[in-house]
Curated annotation (Swiss-Prot):
Main location: cytoplasm
GO CC annotation: cytoplasm
Lineage start: Bacteria, Pseudomonadati, Thermodesulfobacteriota, Desulfovibrionia, Desulfovibrionales
Keyword Magnesium (UniProt): yes
SUPFAM superfamilies recorded: 4'-phosphopantetheinyl transferase (SSF56214)
EC number(s) stated in the UniProt entry for this protein: 2.7.8.7
Keywords: Cytoplasm, Fatty acid biosynthesis, Fatty acid metabolism, Lipid biosynthesis, Lipid metabolism, Magnesium, Metal-binding, Transferase
Co-factor requirement: Mg(2+)
GO biological process, one term: fatty acid biosynthetic process
InterPro entries on file: 4-PPantetheinyl_Trfase_dom (IPR008278), 4-PPantetheinyl_Trfase_dom_sf (IPR037143), ACPS (IPR002582), Ppantetheine-prot_Trfase_dom (IPR004568)
Family (UniProt): Belongs to the P-Pant transferase superfamily. AcpS family.
Subcellular localization: Cytoplasm
Gene: acpS
Name of the protein described by the UniProt record: Holo-[acyl-carrier-protein] synthase
Xref: HAMAP family: AcpS
């Protein structure tokens, strides 16, 4: 049964401005440490925009937004063996997922020229 669903569209230009102004500091503020290691040197802005879209969709699925002690670094976008994105929640985000009774996550992520979009589904 679906217990949460979230969707987000992130403008790549908005992420590019943060990257241009703060660089690695911007990335470390929104990425989990495992994601920082996986961030490609080529086109980091598209990577950041995609990860941010998933994180926004995830907090919508959790029903919390970025509040109650849940921040972007509590949500990790990992990579499944076949290469698909997968959600790994940490800290209060993981506790909220457990409180919802969710045991599975589904993530869809896509990039266009100007945007990155993501859908997250939480399932019990």
């Amino acid at each position: 049964m679906i217990v949460g669903i979230g969707i987000d569209i992130t403008e790549i230009d908005r992420i590019a401005k943060g990257w241009g102004r703060f660089g690695d500091r911007f990335a470390r503020r929104i990425l989990h440490p495992h994601e920082v290691v996986r961030m490609p040197a080529a086109n980091p802005v598209a990577f950041l925009a995609g990860r941010f879209a998933v994180k926004e969709a995830a907090v919508k699925a959790l029903g919390t937004g970025f509040s109650g002690g849940i921040g972007p670094r509590d949500i990790e976008v990992g990579v499944a063996p076949a290469g698909a994105p997968q959600l790994v929640l940490h800290g209060k985000a993981a506790a909220r997922m457990e409180a919802l009774g969710a045991t599975r996550t589904h993530v869809s992520l896509t990039h266009g020229r100007d945007t990155a979009a993501a859908v997250v589904i939480l399932e019990s």
